[in-house]
Amino acid sequence: MSDKVKQLKWLIVLFLFLLAIPSYFAYNHFRQSSALKEAFEKNERIEVLHRLMASEKYAPDIRKAGYVVPPDGAIRLDGGIDSIEIKGDIDLDISNPGRNGVTAYFRIEIDGKITSVLYELDKNFDLVSSAYFQINEKNIKESVTIPKAEEERLLKIVQKELEDFMETMYQTLYG
């Protein structure tokens, strides 16, 4: 009789242990998902981008929302999503955010030449720094300047695209 009680106790312990493992992973998944939603609701843009791009977890959702990310194999190899392509008024690439901001890259035509544009944006998507490059006649990349009004116009487009991205992702995830 005592052997059966011991055996029952061991089965209960084993069952609880086996139940604890999936419970831990389910809790961890819920906690990560709620942290992303909380970042969305607090309008912490850099935190949202960081969480969306930290792994392949949200890649299918980003694709479903109509944005372009690398293939899952490349994401696993890189340890996260290195860039998201946003097709809109301009074709914008945003990189995995740093601690305080995000980099936006796009190409436009200025004065009949293709110009590569690089914007460093802070947590509010305000401009921290900008760089403009064109390929000259000798196939050498050279820095160019653009009028302040043009820079402000482009910045507004970039900010609108990023805000639309954030809104679309929130609707896709929590709709």
Question: Predicted regions span which residues?
Answer:
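Sequence-pattern detector for short linear motifs
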Residues: 7-12, 34, 156
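Hydrophobic membrane-insertion alpha-helices, especially the h-region
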Residues: 9-25
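N-terminal export/targeting and maturation segments
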Residues: 23-105
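A general marker of short, structured functional hotspots
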Residues: 20-23, 54, 63, 161, ...
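Intrinsically disordered, low-complexity segments of exported/surface proteins
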Residues: 6, 14, 28, 106-110
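Extracytoplasmic electrostatic interaction patches
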Residues: 82-175
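Short, Lys/Arg-rich N-terminal segment immediately upstream of the first membrane anchor
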Residues: 1-7
